[in-house]
Each structure stands twice: as C-alpha cells, then as structure tokens.
Amino acid sequence: MRTVLTGASGFVGSNIDKVLVDRHGDVVLSERVDMTDRDAVFAHVRSSQPDAVVHCAILNDWDLMHTDRRLAWKSYVEATRNYADAAAEIDVPFCLVSTDWVFDGTQGGATEDTPPNPINLYGFLKAASEIVALDRGGSVARVMGVNGTHWARPASPREQDPGFGYFVASLVDALETHQPFTVWEGDDINGVASPSLGAMCGEVIRQVIAGGHRGIFHCCGSATTTRRELAEATVDVFGLDRSLLRFGPAPPESFAGQTIPFDTSVSAVATAERLGTPLLSLGDLLASFRHERITGELAPLS
C-alpha cells in the first residue's frame, strides 16, 4: 500500500509509519504540508497517488490552542476536512487518528458507539473532527494511553504528563538510572485509562485502511488501570526497583488551566472482533515495549 500519513514525525505517527513500513512493506508518503491550506493538501494527495490517507498531525501546543481559537479550529477541524475531502476525491480510504479525551471522564468502559462528551478544548476539537471524518465516509481510530517508542526521536527524554501517554517511558527512564519517580495521583488528572502501545495502534490503523473499513475503532489493550497499577506492573515487567516509586499529587503547573477527564477507560472488544486484531493484556503490552527498548525493533504480533 501507498499511504499519505500526516504527523509521521510525532510519537503516534512514528509508530504508524514504523508498522506500515517495517511490518507490512508499505510506502509511506509523509511530506510536510500546511494542513490548513486546502489547495496544498489536495495537490499533495493527488500527486502522491495513495491507496489511503491517515491524518495524525495535530497542533501540539496547548497554550496556543487556547489563545488562538481560530487557528485551533483550522488546525484540527478544517485540516481534517481538507484531508478527508482530498481522499474522497480520489476514492481512497481516510482515517482520522483521534483520542479517548473525547469522553468526559465519567464514561468509563466507553465503547465505539458511546456518544462523546468532551470537557476541554482538545477533546472538543477532536470530537468535531470525528464528525467531519465520519460524515465523509471515513474512519476514526481513537488512541488512548499511548506508550512505546518514539521512533522518530527514540533518544529524547520523556516526561510524565496529566494524561497516560509517555508514562511508562518516563518511569523506566528514571528507575533505570536509580532515580525515584513520583506517580501522580488525584481527581484532577487522568487517573484511569486503557493503555495502548504505539505499535499496536499502528497495526489497528493498518487493518482499518487496508480493509477500507468505516466507522469508529478503539486502539488499546484489554486492561483498565490506574496510574499506580500501571507503575507497579511496569516495575514487575522491566525488573526495576519498586522502592524507588513514590506517589503524590501532580504539580499544579503541569495542568494549569486544563480540565482533564479522570476516567477515560474504554472497550476495544468490538474493534478486535471486527478487525481480528489482538487485545493485548497489560503484561503483554509492557513486554512488547520492553522488547522495543532492548532490540530497537517492533515486537512480533501476538
């Protein structure tokens, strides 16, 4: 397959790229284009002659999103419209990469059919983008609690944030150098989620576009976990020193001005049944990430 992929230099995008190229031998077309420029997007998609379009790029600047709402709308919703319409023009599958933050934090165990109810700007923009993608006959792949390797920048340090992404890498980086790590806990951050592995998300998305599937898909494992439970499982799988774990509130500056959904756990059973993709246990997910860190390669499919 030939796939136009936006956001390939980002964390999730680099995993999609890695899976498409290394596991499936696909060609990924990831030329940087101004995604808010409709003419430029159409020209790029037409000239690339892809078999599918995957839109993963975002405006990854929380402060700018809030200070320039017009730019935020253009960078999320209008950009999605541009790529979805460009894919429709040449009649190829379109997939939008979305998030569990389209839910409000009280909808634990949400399925692919659960109505979104975002409580912050990022979730709202993603939910609006989902409507655009689905209205144009595309698909939506929600990624959640994404951990794993940043293949475009594998040596870059990771920091814990109020969500679940990067959590495992930031913990392992600290404990492997014998530094204590404080696991954030509290009702004002994302305290419960369904973790995923970046490469696993890439595999789900590959199956979606290869099969020309439409609708909503969830990219995660089978487990619902708290931050504390994820930290303790990580210590066990990676063979780290549990005594270095600490537990406490997140620094206020880490989420200043943000409203964050507490419980974003979801079910991916329907996705697994529809696509035939595995639902990894938490232990298998962490073991796959450990394999990536040791070998620098994707773990075999379970």
Regions found by a protein language model. Name each.
Residues 1-20:
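N-terminal Rossmann NAD(P)H-binding glycine-rich loop of SDR-like oxidoreductase domains
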Residues 35-78, 86, 101:
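NAD(P)H-binding glycine-rich loop region in Rossmannoid oxidoreductase-like domains
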Residues 81-117:
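Conserved Rossmann-fold NAD(P)-dependent oxidoreductase catalytic core, especially the SDR/UDP-sugar
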Residues 117-144, 169:
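Active-site Tyr-X1-5-Lys
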Residues 136-199:
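NAD(P)-dependent short-chain dehydrogenase/reductase
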Residues 183-192, 217-224, 274:
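Glycine-rich Rossmann NAD(P)(H)-binding loop
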Residues 197-257, 290-302:
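Mid/C-terminal beta-alpha module of Rossmann-like enzyme folds, strongest
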Residues 243-244, 259-302:
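C-terminal amphipathic/interface module of NAD(P)-dependent oxidoreductases
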